A protein has these predicted regions:
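Transmembrane alpha-helices and adjacent helix-loop boundaries
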Residues: 1-321
Length: 321
């Protein structure tokens, strides 16, 4: 698609035209676009609502950061450990839920419970800092070391851009594969999908494990970008809500929805924050209030999300039925 190529070209050129603040905002936008796309596999494609996705961010971040801090193992090797840990955790949650028929809102509650268990557990896990947090060595910002993910913000920008593009392409392939068609059948009517001979347990497990593993990668990026991890920070319900806002606003179940939602939500939030700060109204919690208001408006005006409406308006893509 021509519009996708144009967007990618703009994103590739953006760091050379943006100041430090705008570059930071773009990194945050792409981070939420990536995590939103990973969550979109579980809910948007397969219809399994997770409200505890922060557990995978936390597990991935702690796995890679602990290996780096304690053993000097680089983040790219640590990333493999992070993906494995996240996927195993997702498999455990999925197996317990789907084997015993836990679905819908009860599955969502189960995911929150696991995230809370992880938060409490890591609060008392002294090897990774406990409640005091785990800190990575301060990076040398005069140069970039891609192998150790240490260096200038522009390096992190291109890393998260590459991850976001790769995830978009992977989801494009998955959605148009047999697995993707089975996911959509399960999402629309699981009983009917089962009656047609689809192994719903297996394909729901695929969705959970893939989504969990991909989200764990975001945890690695988070740890090395911010240089610290706190259980209250990475396992919180607020972190999970931040992940799902992009696809919910942009359009869950669509490929472009999480990206559009991340740009719209984070871009508007930062603009609003700057305007409020200019007049001295930058009170704590302002962003969260703004997120809630935007989500409320979208649910009322465009419950399917912004992207289906925008795609229909511009003739870019057929709306999802």
């Amino acid at each position: 698609m021509a519009w996708l190529a144009a967007l990618l070209a703009a994103l590739l050129a953006a760091p050379w035209l943006a100041n430090d603040y705008l570059l930071t905002v773009l990194i945050i936008i792409l981070y939420f676009a990536y995590t939103g796309q990973a969550w979109n596999i579980m809910f948007g494609f397969a219809g399994q609502l997770s409200l505890g996705h922060a557990i995978y961010v936390g597990l991935g971040g702690y796995a890679a950061a602990a290996l780096y801090v304690h053993f000097g193992i680089g983040p790219w090797i640590g990333l493999m450990a992070a993906v494995a840990l996240g996927a195993v955790c997702g498999a455990i949650i999925g197996f317990l839920a789907f084997r015993f028929g836990v679905g819908g809102v009860y599955f969502a509650i189960l995911t929150i419970a696991f995230a809370e268990f992880a938060r409490i557990g890591f609060d008392h896990f002294s090897w990774v800092g406990g409640s005091g947090g785990l800190f990575l060595p301060v990076a040398n910002y005069s140069q970039s070391d891609i192998w150790n993910l240490r260096g200038k913000p522009i390096m992190f920008y291109y890393v998260i851009l590459a991850l976001t593009v790769a995830t978009f392409l992977l989801c494009h392939v998955l959605l148009r594969s047999r697995v993707g068609y089975y996911w959509q059948a399960i999402r629309e009517d699981e009983a009917a999908a089962r009656a047609l001979g689809i192994d719903t347990f297996r394909y729901k497990m695929y969705a959970v494990v893939i989504s969990a593993g991909m989200t764990s990668v975001a945890g690695v990026f988070f740890a090395f970008y911010y240089n610290n991890l706190f259980p209250e920070q990475v396992f919180s319900i607020g972190r999970s809500i931040e992940i799902i806002l992009g696809p919910m606003i942009g359009g869950a179940g669509t490929l472009a929805g999480p990206i559009v939602g991340a740009f719209l939500l984070t871009g508007l939030a930062e603009t609003m924050w700057e305007l409020l700060r200019a007049v001295g109204l930058d009170a704590p919690g302002t962003r969260q209030v703004f997120y809630g208001l935007v989500l409320l408006v979208i649910i009322i005006v465009q419950p399917a999300g912004v992207w289906p409406w925008l795609a229909r308006l511009l003739g870019l893509e057929k709306p999802r039925s």
